[in-house]
């Protein structure tokens, strides 16, 4: 599942994203954030974090540096 989601993001970056001007308000970009989140947290939580990030990426949000959160150690 993880490989499929990352493949979809890479496909978007290769085929769809070049058709539009750069518009992501965040650093790293939303697609890079998605790849990092899925690699770090797995398919379910990574996709959830990515969805939240995409929903925040709009003209009324200031954007800026917003890295993937670190993995919290289990107690």
From Swiss-Prot:
In the UniProt record, does the keyword Ion transport occur?
no
What are the boundaries of the signal sequence?
none
**A GO CC term assigned to this protein in UniProt:** plasma membrane
Membrane recorded as keyword: yes
Where does the source fall among the domains of life?
Bacteria
- Please name the SMART domains in this protein's record: Haemolytic (SM01234)
InterPro entries under this entry?
A: Membr_insert_effic_factor_YidD
Membrane-traversing stretches: none
- Its membrane topology: Peripheral membrane protein
Give the keywords, sorted: Cell inner membrane, Cell membrane, Membrane
Compartment(s)? Cell inner membrane
Please describe what this protein does.
Answer: Could be involved in insertion of integral membrane proteins into the membrane.
Family stated for the protein in its record? Belongs to the UPF0161 family.
Q: What is this protein called?
A: Putative membrane protein insertion efficiency factor
Organism of origin: Gloeothece citriformis (strain PCC 7424) (Cyanothece sp. (strain PCC 7424))
């Amino acid at each position: 599942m993880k490989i499929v989601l990352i493949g979809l993001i890479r496909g978007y970056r290769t085929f769809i994203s070049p058709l539009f001007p750069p518009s992501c308000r965040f650093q790293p970009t939303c697609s890079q954030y998605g790849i990092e989140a899925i690699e770090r947290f797995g398919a379910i939580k990574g996709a959830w974090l990515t969805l939240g990030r995409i929903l925040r990426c709009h003209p009324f949000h200031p954007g800026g540096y917003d890295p993937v959160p670190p993995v919290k150690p289990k107690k």
